[in-house]
Amino acid sequence: MLQNQDTMEILSNSTSKFPTFLLTGIPGLESAHVWISIPFCCFYAIALSGNSVILFVIITQQSLHEPMYYFLFRLSATDLGLTVSSLSTTLGILWFEAREISLYSCIVQMFFLHGFTFMESGVLVATAFDRYVAICDPLRYTTILTNSRIIQMGLLMITRAIVLILPLLLLLKPLYFCRMNALSHSYCYHPDVIQLACSDIRANSICGLIDLILTTGIDTPCIVLSYILIIHSVLRIASPEEWHKVFSTCVSHVGAVAFFYIHMLSLSLVYRYGRSAPRVVHSVMANVYLLLPPVLNPIIDSVKTKQIRKAMLSLLLTK
């Protein structure tokens, strides 16, 4: 009896149901965090301003109230959400060494981070469908992609994200966490958080894998299929001008898909199979995964999308 009591005391002293986690900046470069914050601030400023400008341009310019730009609007909105979700914790660490975060704050951050990630995956699929219809069936474009159907697609993206993220977070509630509670990077990432649990995390890992399959595992083949059909259709076009037009139409979306899925899959694989990798690898990949798409997407969209570029110029000239 006494031995069992001692065991329970040791367990209670080494675990916690409501822990405080310690976020990590760039491991090994803590003394240079203030200097490292300069490029981070630049990236955040580009992501926030670039996506905000695209949202403003699409809202204010009547000529951009078309399906293609509605999807671009949603992409910028999700990129903005991803940026804001990690902004406070990342800069808090780099500027003030504010590393502590409670479990509940961590859950809230994961809700928005993973939720916006799932939504962005859905937006990329919807945009691929938009490009497929525009190129392969242009005569029926306006009848297929009506405003009501676009709204339904948007609601479906949000619903899917919420349905996928809630079980993932609810399964964290029964877990006990070890006192060694340092996370690998500057925000709460679900695979990183569950690795600190002293409880059985098989259900959490399975749920995370199911979410990955239901997003990346389904969305990526759908996007690939849409572009296979687009390429098959374009191969029958003899005019170089038409080839160039199709390429210009699709290049920004292909770039967004590449930035998003390559880094998401790389980060997932590192957490599942690269546990021996240095901590700095986890940290750098995690920050690149969140920052690169929101920074590059508005730049590519404004450069490669002629109508967006014209709308921006008209706004600047009128002022």
From Swiss-Prot:
GO MF terms held by the record: G protein-coupled receptor activity; olfactory receptor activity
Q: Can you list the disulfide-bonded cysteine pairs?
A: C106-C188
Q: Write the record's keywords in alphabetical order, separated by commas.
A: Cell membrane, Disulfide bond, G-protein coupled receptor, Membrane, Olfaction, Receptor, Sensory transduction, Transducer, Transmembrane, Transmembrane helix
Q: Which is one Pfam family of this protein?
A: 7tm_4
Q: Which SUPFAM superfamilies match?
A: Family A G protein-coupled receptor-like
Q: Where are the transmembrane segments?
A: 38-58, 76-96, 107-127, 150-170, 212-232, 250-270, 280-300
Positions in the Cytoplasmic compartment: 59-75, 128-149, 233-249, 301-319
The yes or no answer to whether the keyword Cell membrane is present is: yes
Topology of this chain in the membrane: Multi-pass membrane protein
Cellular compartment(s) = Cell membrane
Any one of the GO CC terms: plasma membrane
Extracellular compartment ranges equal 1-37, 97-106, 171-211, 271-279
Q: Which InterPro entries match?
A: GPCR_Rhodpsn, GPCR_Rhodpsn_7TM, Olfact_rcpt, OR51/52/56-like
Q: Which CDD domains match?
A: 7tmA_OR51-like
The UniProt family comment states: Belongs to the G-protein coupled receptor 1 family.
Q: What does this protein do?
A: Odorant receptor.
Tell me what this protein is called: Olfactory receptor 51F1
State the organism named in the record. Answer: Homo sapiens (Human)
Gene field = OR51F1
